[in-house]
Amino acid sequence: MTNVIKYLAEGEALPLEDHPSVLLPASYDIVWSLVVFIIVLILFWKFVRPKYQEVLTEREDRIKGGIQRAEAAQAEAKAALEKYNAQLAEARAEAAEIREEARAKGKQIEAEMKAKATEESNRIIESGEKQLAAQREQVVTELRREMGQNSISLAERLLGDQLSDDVKRSGTIDKFLAELDTVSPAGK
């Protein structure tokens, strides 16, 4: 350390300090640093860069493949959505058609049932009218017979004489009933 102080006191430079610049290293340091840098650069260029390029290319291919797969999946999904929408529209149209057919069939069944009910009602009314007419005829016939008998008895009492002849009896009954019909028509 005394040597350093001696050199500094005399104003001389230290033995390892030949160069005047503080920022620039010694020339031999620059040369050897360049040699090592070139060797490292060559090694990097020969071994690291191709692997790095291969990894980048592979990654680029994977990204492109992923994009293509995504586009294909998106196109497939879009096609599936369009197919689904088409099937949905078809199903809705079919449902509307079935609904309309059911309405038409329901109206047809309703009309048939109304027609059958009307027909049955008319048949029942007609049957009732026929039955009523038959009963009316039966009642009229019974009334004529009874009235005929009653009129004969009444006529015999009034005349005091007995009508023995069936022809006379029948004629008298018919005449009486004809007069009765002209005065008041039967059943009306």
Curated annotation (Swiss-Prot):
Chief location bin: membrane
Signal peptide: none
UniProt subunit comment: F-type ATPases have 2 components, F(1) - the catalytic core - and F(0) - the membrane proton channel. F(1) has five subunits: alpha(3), beta(3), gamma(1), delta(1), epsilon(1). F(0) has three main subunits: a(1), b(2) and c(10-14). The alpha and beta chains form an alternating ring which encloses part of the gamma chain. F(1) is attached to F(0) by a central stalk formed by the gamma and epsilon chains, while a peripheral stalk is formed by the delta and b chains.
Cellular component terms (Gene Ontology): plasma membrane; proton-transporting ATP synthase complex
Disulfide bonds: none
Record keywords: ATP synthesis, Cell membrane, CF(0), Hydrogen ion transport, Ion transport, Membrane, Transmembrane, Transmembrane helix, Transport
PANTHER family cross-referenced by the UniProt entry: ATP SYNTHASE SUBUNIT B, ATP SYNTHASE SUBUNIT B', CHLOROPLASTIC
Residue ranges the record marks as coiled coil: none
Family from the record: Belongs to the ATPase B chain family.
Its job: F(1)F(0) ATP synthase produces ATP from ADP in the presence of a proton or sodium gradient. F-type ATPases consist of two structural domains, F(1) containing the extramembraneous catalytic core and F(0) containing the membrane proton channel, linked together by a central stalk and a peripheral stalk. During catalysis, ATP synthesis in the catalytic domain of F(1) is coupled via a rotary mechanism of the central stalk subunits to proton translocation. Component of the F(0) channel, it forms part of the peripheral stalk, linking F(1) to F(0).
Membrane topology designation: Single-pass membrane protein
InterPro entries: ATP_synth_B-like_membr_sf, ATP_synth_b/b'su_bac/chlpt, ATP_synth_F0_bsu_bac, ATP_synthase_B_chain
Species name: Corynebacterium diphtheriae (strain ATCC 700971 / NCTC 13129 / Biotype gravis)
Residues that span the membrane, as ranges: 24-44
Name by which UniProt lists this protein: ATP synthase subunit b
NCBIfam families cross-referenced by the UniProt entry: ATP_synt_b (TIGR01144), PRK05759.1-3 (NF004412)
GO molecular function, one term: proton-transporting ATPase activity, rotational mechanism
Compartments, record wording: Cell membrane
